[in-house]
């Protein structure tokens, strides 16, 4: 089945660490730590947890020079590329560049005078570090606030182009741009305007989207709209929640649009009085148990025969509820074995894990060592 994205926007290619960004590269998932950066152990543990779930890039706030020293210790203990989030003090950018940061998230306009901006850009150039220009509707320049009275797509665009012009004048093109807002329509319209004006990679997201539920909904709509139009090269789902949830929602959005698949896509009915087993409890438990599986798979769990067969025929593994025991399908073929409804969770987990192992084995590339001439 084809994805919903047509004519993905063409952009320049940059690299954040070893992760390619733009120019047709896979859309990268990013999250951000919410620990105190000076708490090295907690920050490292959170970064590693995000990486295990599939985060391609992790952003870390570095608000002080002391935090920059701790960033060095953090960088030494993780493998995933790190973005340092820096504002106001240009010296922090110079310091983390020496410590191996993979990207600087700054606004050139709030780093200081032209000499300081040049110092940061020259440092980034010397260390082959890209920059992300991050425009946010909540922190626009005062003169633009006075000019427009309220955030609009036009003011976010003007702010972005102002920052981009600074880098252009310094002959620096290794950067990506974001124009975020907490209002979904404002963010979407701003990104559309920006995408029509520049060919740099775009980092997309709905900033300060809210809690786990409402934030996920806003992000799915906003990010989904942009991705469906071919706009976006990296993304972050910003939630007032555990950053782990950000990565989960991000991959759910990408899976829903069939842009990038990772892990299990659960297809489950909302249940009614026809269900023959506890569908909701089964899905909830399996989602937790099978978080470690990265193999793309479609798993249908339907409580009765009304839609169960149709979904099972299109799934890697499907179960259709029946009285006392349920029908089991693999790759659309009904199996002789049936699941006892009392033990359906354990039985499904075993079958799904076995299927994942088989798919992984089939997808392995056989390396043939040719004899040396």
Swiss-Prot record:
Q: Which cofactor does it need?
A: [4Fe-4S] cluster
Can you provide one Gene Ontology molecular function annotated for this UniProt record?
A: 4 iron, 4 sulfur cluster binding
Query: What's a GO biological-process term for it?
Result: isopentenyl diphosphate biosynthetic process, methylerythritol 4-phosphate pathway
Q: In which pathway does it act?
A: Isoprenoid biosynthesis; isopentenyl diphosphate biosynthesis via DXP pathway; isopentenyl diphosphate from 1-deoxy-D-xylulose 5-phosphate: step 5/6
Catalytic activity as recorded in UniProt: (2E)-4-hydroxy-3-methylbut-2-enyl diphosphate + oxidized [flavodoxin] + H2O + 2 H(+) = 2-C-methyl-D-erythritol 2,4-cyclic diphosphate + reduced [flavodoxin]
Positions bound to [4Fe-4S] cluster = 269, 272, 304, 311
The organism sits in which domain of life? Bacteria
According to its UniProt record, this protein's enzyme class is: oxidoreductase
One Pfam short name: GcpE
Keywords annotated in UniProt? 4Fe-4S, Iron, Iron-sulfur, Isoprene biosynthesis, Metal-binding, Oxidoreductase
Annotated EC: 1.17.7.3
| Cofactor binding, per record | Binds 1 [4Fe-4S] cluster.
Concerning its family, UniProt says: Belongs to the IspG family.
Q: What does this protein do?
A: Converts 2C-methyl-D-erythritol 2,4-cyclodiphosphate (ME-2,4cPP) into 1-hydroxy-2-methyl-2-(E)-butenyl 4-diphosphate.
What protein does this entry describe? Answer: 4-hydroxy-3-methylbut-2-en-1-yl diphosphate synthase (flavodoxin)
Q: What is the native source organism of this protein?
A: Baumannia cicadellinicola subsp. Homalodisca coagulata
């Amino acid at each position: 089945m084809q994805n919903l994205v047509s004519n993905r926007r063409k952009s320049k290619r940059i690299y954040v660490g070893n992760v390619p960004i733009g120019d047709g590269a896979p859309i990268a998932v990013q999250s951000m730590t919410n620990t105190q950066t000076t708490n090295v152990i907690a920050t490292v543990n959170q970064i590693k947890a995000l990486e295990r779930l599939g985060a391609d890039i992790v952003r870390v706030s570095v608000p002080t020079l002391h935090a920059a020293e701790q960033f060095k210790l953090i960088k030494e203990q993780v493998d995933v590329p790190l973005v340092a989030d820096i504002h106001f003090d240009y010296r922090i950018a110079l310091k983390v560049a020496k410590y191996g940061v993979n990207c600087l998230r700054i606004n050139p306009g709030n780093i200081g005078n032209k000499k300081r901006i040049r110092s940061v850009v020259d440092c980034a150039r010397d260390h082959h570090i890209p920059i992300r220009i991050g425009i946010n509707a909540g922190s626009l320049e005062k003169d633009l606030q006075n000019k427009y009275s309220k955030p609009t797509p036009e003011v976010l665009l003007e702010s972005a182009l102002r920052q981009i012009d600074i880098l252009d004048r310094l002959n620096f093109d290794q950067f990506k741009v974001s124009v975020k807002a907490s209002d979904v329509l404002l963010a979407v319209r701003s990104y559309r305007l920006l995408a029509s004006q520049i060919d740099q990679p775009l980092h997309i997201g709905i900033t300060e989207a809210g809690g786990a539920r409402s934030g996920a909904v806003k992000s799915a709509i906003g990010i989904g709209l942009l991705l469906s139009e071919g706009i976006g090269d990296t993304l972050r789902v910003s939630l007032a929640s555990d950053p782990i949830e950000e990565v989960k929602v991000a991959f759910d959005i990408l899976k829903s649009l069939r842009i990038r698949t990772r892990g299990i896509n659960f297809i489950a009915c909302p249940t009614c009085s026809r269900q023959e087993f506890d569908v909701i409890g089964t899905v909830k438990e399996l989602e937790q148990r099978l978080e470690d599986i990265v193999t793309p798979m479609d798993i249908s769990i339907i409580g009765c025969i009304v839609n169960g067969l149709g979904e099972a025929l299109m799934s890697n593994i499907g179960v259709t509820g029946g009285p006392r025991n349920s029908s089991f399908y693999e790759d659309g073929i009904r199996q002789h074995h049936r699941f006892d409804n009392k033990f359906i969770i354990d039985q499904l987990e075993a079958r799904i894990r076995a299927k994942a192992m088989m798919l992984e084995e089939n997808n392995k590339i056989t390396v043939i060592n040719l004899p040396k001439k």
